[in-house]
C-alpha cells in the first residue's frame, strides 16, 4: 500500500504542473491587470507603466511562467500585488480562519445529517421521511446564499444573538477573550453552512440504509433472531456508511477549500473571500497560488478517500 | 490629503442638494460613550498606517480617528490650507520654498516628539523604489533633488532641509518652480503627512509594508489611537493621551467593514452610528430608516461623455487629434450633447443624488467655478437639429438619419457596465440621438465589461473602433485638470489637442494665477471654452450621503471641519431606534 501511496503522490507533480500552466495562461487572458485599479488623475501613468514593467507583465506569458516556476520550486510563490505581502503569509492567515470555521461546520453537518437520514430511512414513506426529503429538496433547490442572508437577518439583526460579520470582536483583547470571541463569530456561518448543506450526506446515507436493509445478510440475521436494534447498529449502519466514508478524504481537504458564498456574505475573511477579491483585483500571484492549493487539495482528497476506504472496507485493497 | 476633520458654527447651515451637511442634534452629548461606525466594502480593509505605502480607500477613511495616516494641515471647506493644524505651511515665491513648521507639542501616540525627519521620511518611502510604493508622481519631481533620489542617483534629497536639525520642528522644501495650486491640499507638489522615523528606521524597506509597526501596532498623531487592529476587519480606537488638540469626548470608537448586502439591515437594527461609503442605489432603502438622519455632501467627482478624436503618441507623450470622423466638427459634438436628456435621467434613476453638470468643475470648488457657466444640462433638440442643419447634415426621410456627401451620420457608443440601470440609460440616449437623426449603436451591440473598457481606453495609442464613451473621475482637492485634458494627458481618452484649451490649462497653473481672482477667472474661461468646443461633455455632479444615528452629536460631512473626531459624541449609551 505504501508504494501505491508514494506513486500517487509522485503522480501529483505532473498533474499540478499542467494545472499551473493552465491557470497561468487563463489568468493572463482576463482583461485588466493588478495595476488597472491604480489608474486615475492622481496617479502618474508613467509610474503605472513602470510598475507593470518592473513586475514583468510585458514579458511573454511563458517567460513570466518560467520565472514564477523557478521561484515556486524554491517555495516562494511571490508577493501579492494588491496586498503587498508574501502570498504564503496571506494564505496562511486566511487558511487558519477558514480551517476552524470549516471544521465546525463539518462537525455540525454530520450532527444534523446523520440522525436526519436514520430517522428518514427507518420510517420510509411515512411523514418523518417526507418531512426530511422535502427539507433537503428545498435546501438543495434554493441557492444557499438566500438562506444565509435570512439567517443573518433573523439571528444577527432581529434577535441580536450573534455577530454578523468578521472573525473576532475588536473589543476582545487577550488570549482567552479572543478565543471565545472567535468561536462566537464562527457559530452563525458554520451553523448556516451545516443546516443548509445536509443534502449530500442525507441522500447517500438514507439510500445506503434503505439498500442495506433488503440485503441477504440482514434477512439471515433476522432469521437467526438477532434483535432489530443490533442488526441496525452492527450491520446496516456500518455498511451504509461506506459511501460517506468514500467521500471523507474530500471532506478533510475541503476544510481548506474555503466557502466562497458564506465567507463573502458573512464578511468572514477566509480563503473563499480571498479568492474572489484576488480575481476582481487581478492579483495573479494570489489567484495562481489559490488554484494550485485547491488542485493539490483535490488530488490529496482523492488519495485520502481511497486510503480511508481501504481501512474501513476489508474487501478493498489499494493496489 | 489626510487631514483631521471639525465643525465651526458658520458651516452648520450648509446644504448639499436637499441634504443637510451637518446634523444639528437638539440633545446634549453624554460624558464618554462608545461610537460604532462602519465602512461599506465587499473586500477586507488593508490596514497600512503609512500614507506613502497605502492604497486602500476603505482604510484611508477608517484611519480618520487616528489622524488620517497622519495628515498635518488644516484646510477650509474648499481645501485651501489654513493655519491651526498639526503643522503650518508658508510658501515663499522669491526663494521658491515651502516652510513647514510642526507644532511644538506635536507628539506620536507613544509620547515621542514628531520631528522634521519624520516629515522627510514620507518622501523616502514614496521615492525610494526599495519600499515598493506606487505613489510616486511627476509633480514630486518639482522638488529639487527628489527625482535624483528616486532614480538612485543621490543618497539624500537635496531639496529638503532642516534649518534647526533633523530633530527640530522646521522643514524647508526647495522647489524648481512655484505653482498656484500649492495653496490647495492634495496638490501633489509636496506631501502632507509624517511617518515615525525613529520607530521604523530599523525595519528593512522591503518588510516595511507588512511590518506590524505599520499595520497593527502603529504610532499616530490624531485624537484617537488604535488599541486593536483586526486585520481586514475592524479597528478599535481609544483617546490618544498625547494628542495636541481638542480632547475627544468619546471613550472609544469601533470602526468595522460591513458588506454591501448587509449594511441596510445593519442600520435598520441600529448596529452602527453611521456607515460611510454607501452607494446611490441603496438610498431608497435608507432615506426613511427609523432612528437615522441622512446627511449629504457634494462628491468630489465628475462624470462626462468623451468623443474619440485621435490617438495617443506614447513615444512623444502627446495626444494627436487626427481621426477621420464627423465628430471633428464642433457642431456635431455640440448637437450630440444637446440631444441628451441628462436631467430626466438623473431625475428618474439617481434618487436625487445626481444633478446635471454645467461644467467640468463640481460646485464644491466654489472658489474656482461659477453657476453662470452654461453647459448641456437641458435637452434642446431644436438647437441640436439646427446645429446639424447648419453643418450640412441633411435628413434622409426614408432612413430617418442624417447624411452628408452620401455618408450616414452613424456612431459607435462604447458604454460600459455600471449599476443596474446602465443599459437602460445607454439605450435611452441612443433613442434621444435618433430624434436628431444621429444613428448610434452600442459597441459590439452590448455594454462593455468594465476591465475591458479600461484596457480599451487607456492602452496607447487608443482604438479607432468607437466614437462616444462615458467616463467618470474622482477629483483631487486641487482641481486643476492638466492630468485629465492636457495635450500630454494619457487619460484624455478622446485625444483632443487644442491650443486654446492648452493655453487655458496652463493659465490656471501659471504664476499669474497665484492671484486668486485671476485664477478663478482662468478657471471660468477654461470651463466655458471646454463647453463651447465640446471635446468632452459634462454629464453629472453627484452627492454622497451618510445615514447618521440620532444619538450622534456633532456630526458633519463638511470638508472644512477639522476637529470632527474630537467634537463627535453621543447623547445616550444605546443607539436611537426612533
From Swiss-Prot, chain A:
<feature type="transmembrane region" description="Helical">
    <location>
        <begin position="183"/>
        <end position="203"/>
    </location>
</feature>
<feature type="transmembrane region" description="Helical">
    <location>
        <begin position="99"/>
        <end position="119"/>
    </location>
</feature>
<dbReference type="GO" id="GO:0055085">
    <property type="term" value="P:transmembrane transport"/>
</dbReference>
<dbReference type="InterPro" id="IPR035906">
    <property type="entry name" value="MetI-like_sf"/>
</dbReference>
<dbReference type="GO" id="GO:0005886">
    <property type="term" value="C:plasma membrane"/>
</dbReference>
<keyword id="KW-0653">Protein transport</keyword>
<dbReference type="Pfam" id="PF00528">
    <property type="entry name" value="BPD_transp_1"/>
</dbReference>
<dbReference type="GO" id="GO:0015031">
    <property type="term" value="P:protein transport"/>
</dbReference>
<keyword id="KW-0571">Peptide transport</keyword>
<dbReference type="Pfam" id="PF19300">
    <property type="entry name" value="BPD_transp_1_N"/>
</dbReference>
<keyword id="KW-0472">Membrane</keyword>
<keyword id="KW-0813">Transport</keyword>
<comment type="function">
    <text>Part of the ABC transporter complex OppABCDF involved in the uptake of oligopeptides. Probably responsible for the translocation of the substrate across the membrane. Essential for uptake of peptides larger than three amino acids and for growth in milk.</text>
</comment>
<dbReference type="InterPro" id="IPR045621">
    <property type="entry name" value="BPD_transp_1_N"/>
</dbReference>
<keyword id="KW-1003">Cell membrane</keyword>
<feature type="domain" description="ABC transmembrane type-1">
    <location>
        <begin position="95"/>
        <end position="305"/>
    </location>
</feature>
<feature type="transmembrane region" description="Helical">
    <location>
        <begin position="9"/>
        <end position="29"/>
    </location>
</feature>
<feature type="transmembrane region" description="Helical">
    <location>
        <begin position="289"/>
        <end position="309"/>
    </location>
</feature>
<feature type="transmembrane region" description="Helical">
    <location>
        <begin position="248"/>
        <end position="268"/>
    </location>
</feature>
<keyword id="KW-0812">Transmembrane</keyword>
<keyword id="KW-1133">Transmembrane helix</keyword>
<dbReference type="InterPro" id="IPR000515">
    <property type="entry name" value="MetI-like"/>
</dbReference>
<dbReference type="GO" id="GO:0015833">
    <property type="term" value="P:peptide transport"/>
</dbReference>
<protein>
    <recommendedName>
        <fullName>Oligopeptide transport system permease protein OppB</fullName>
    </recommendedName>
</protein>
<comment type="similarity">
    <text>Belongs to the binding-protein-dependent transport system permease family. OppBC subfamily.</text>
</comment>
<feature type="transmembrane region" description="Helical">
    <location>
        <begin position="137"/>
        <end position="157"/>
    </location>
</feature>
<comment type="subunit">
    <text>The complex is composed of two ATP-binding proteins (OppD and OppF), two transmembrane proteins (OppB and OppC) and a solute-binding protein (OppA).</text>
</comment>
